[in-house]
A protein has these predicted regions:
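Catalytic glycan-binding domains that act on GlcNAc-containing polysaccharides
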Residues: 1-120, 124-132, 136-163
């Protein structure tokens, strides 16, 4: 069979690159074919990938936050290429308006992302904003898109830590 991928070469529901297929995709339904457009292979392959890259099952991925206006620009990340200025939550919380409504352990290291800042003309500089953790960065190793990582992490919440 011929595989057809996206313009960048990714295949299936979870956009696996050829090397990712080789290293992480599994024939979960044991029909002697890995089909990444079939739920029986695609979802277990994605779960296998996350497990192998070091996903921490009981740690958060991100929280949507509201930022204080006084946050220094250096703490705002808008590129997936290099998440910078990671700090402990106990430091970053001073810049988060809705911190008291979040259930975050203060000893975790995190960064702040503003995904719309550099690509949407006229986007509000501080909204939407997210505080992201190590699991989020694991997803960026899979696909260097801030939005892709947010989508995967949102699905993770829907699956209640089953992956």
């Amino acid at each position: 069979q011929t595989l057809y991928g996206s313009w960048a070469g990714a295949f299936g529901y979870f956009q696996f690159m050829p090397s990712t297929i080789t290293n992480y995709a599994i024939d979960h339904n044991q029909d002697n074919m890995i089909n990444l457009k079939d739920n029986e292979d695609a979802y277990p392959s994605a779960a296998n990938y996350l497990k192998k890259i070091g996903w921490k099952k009981n740690q958060p991925c991100f929280f949507k936050i509201e930022l204080q206006e006084n946050i220094p620009e250096k703490y705002l990340n808008s590129s997936a290429r290099n998440i910078k200025n990671k700090r402990k939550i106990k430091f970053l919380k001073r810049y988060i308006k809705n911190f008291d409504n979040l259930n975050i352990r203060e000893n975790l290291t995190a960064a702040i992302i503003i995904p719309d800042k550099d690509i949407i003309p006229g986007a509000k500089t501080l909204s939407p904003a997210y505080i992201v953790f190590e699991n989020y960065e694991k997803i960026l190793n899979w696909n260097r898109s801030l939005r892709f990582a947010l989508a995967v992490c949102t699905l993770k919440e829907r699956f209640n830590n089953e992956i």
